[in-house]
Structures are given as structure tokens and as C-alpha cells.
């Protein structure tokens, strides 16, 4: 029974993390922000999320940012610099490096293709 209670609590924390992520990914990409909000350590958050979803908490954050970045590149007339700032990157270069590292192509190439 104790294990079942722990599983319920773990699922609740993971659900809370995802809810926080939906509301905050544009401004907060650091794991510590989310773990602090949930009153747990970053390591424990990572363990719970990975155990429950087979994807790390960091990957969840990264995916939300990339999905939004792709949507903005496809459907808006905003410049890459404007999108970078909207997603709280220091500048276009930082966003472009992040985007290329995750997707394999630059934001401008993504925009041209899609």
C-alpha cells in the first residue's frame, strides 16, 4: 500500500510539473525554477519525471520551447530576433544555437522549409 501511495504522489508531482511548464516555459527553462515551485530538489524532480514519462524534465522543457518556436516560425511574421526575445533568450544567436542543437537545422532554414 505504501508503494501505491508513493506512485500517486509521484504522478501528482509530475502532473503539477507539466502544468507549471505549460504556464512558464516561455520565461523559465531552468529546472531549479520548477523544482523550487514544487518544493523538491531538481534531482528528485528529474527522477520522478523520467520514471513516470520516460523523458527527462529537461527534455520536457526543451520540447515545449521548440514546439512554440516552430509554431511561431511557421505562423507569424515575427523576426527570429522577436521570437528569441518572446521565448526569453538573451539574443537571436543563443536561440539559433539552441534551436539547431535540438532540431538539427537553424530557425531560418526551418522557416524556409515549412
Model-assigned labels for residue ranges:
Residues 51-93, 112-114:
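Terminal helix-turn-helix DNA-binding modules in bacterial transcription factors
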Residues 1-19, 23-33, 37, 51-59, ...:
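Short, Lys/Arg-enriched, Trp-marked, Pro/Gly-tolerant hinge/linker segments that flank
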Residues 38, 87-88, 99:
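Core residues of bacterial helix-turn-helix
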Residues 97-114:
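…primarily DNA-binding HTH/wHTH and HhH modules…
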Residues 45, 94-95, 99:
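Short hydrophobic/aromatic patch on the recognition helix
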Amino acid at each position: 500500500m505504501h508503494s501505491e501511495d508513493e506512485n500517486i504522489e509521484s504522478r501528482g508531482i509530475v502532473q503539477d510539473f507539466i502544468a507549471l511548464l505549460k504556464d512558464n516555459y516561455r520565461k523559465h527553462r531552468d529546472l531549479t525554477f520548477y523544482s523550487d515551485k514544487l518544493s523538491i530538489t531538481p534531482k528528485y524532480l528529474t527522477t520522478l519525471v523520467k520514471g513516470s514519462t520516460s523523458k527527462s524534465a529537461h527534455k520536457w522543457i526543451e520540447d515545449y520551447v521548440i514546439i512554440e518556436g516552430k509554431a511561431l516560425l511557421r505562423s507569424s511574421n515575427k523576426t527570429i530576433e522577436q521570437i528569441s526575445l518572446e521565448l526569453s533568450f538573451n539574443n537571436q544567436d543563443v536561440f539559433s544555437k539552441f534551436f539547431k542543437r535540438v532540431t538539427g537545422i537553424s530557425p531560418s532554414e526551418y522557416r524556409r522549409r515549412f
